[in-house]
Amino acid sequence: MPLIDIYCVADHEFDETMWVDGLLTQGEVGIASVADMVAKVQARCAGGDRIRELRVFGHGDEWGQYFGADWVNEQTAMHRFRPQLEQLRGLFGPGGFMTLGGCDVGEAAALLRALFAIVGVPAQAFMAKQYPVFPGDEGRRRRCSDRCEVSGSQAWEHVDTVLDPLRERFHRKLQGLRDRF
């Protein structure tokens, strides 16, 4: 039973950040909601493959993260989305884990603990802004299973000063493309 990585990117509406992330990620799975993500992950594992890493990329903050159009925090994970998320149990291989790729989601320790309790594998996220055009994850990592641990270094402090002019240029070009069509 091969171990696979699954990279889910919110695609419920057009968003420049998600679009760039999807463009730079080969084989990403576009997701519209928690239910959509679960169904697509189950389909990817239907042949017997098991998950090494399930990475979910969506906008986030210190309280939670979007899974497509669904806002997932500790409360919604434990109540509203629990029946759907529980369907991921058993799809992970040995050492499998879940990564949330939204900005500052590593601060949401309660959410990470809730995901561990529901899905049954460690859940991790990073404690800084995340940028799809830079490889790797930014900031310290919080990984929660039966307990939470923080490791790693601080995020690049210079990233915003480098990215802000690039973002502005990118948005102008993108707006120009939109205006043409």
Where are these regions (language model features)?
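Short amphipathic alpha-helices and their capping/turn segments at secondary-structure boundaries
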Residues: 34-52
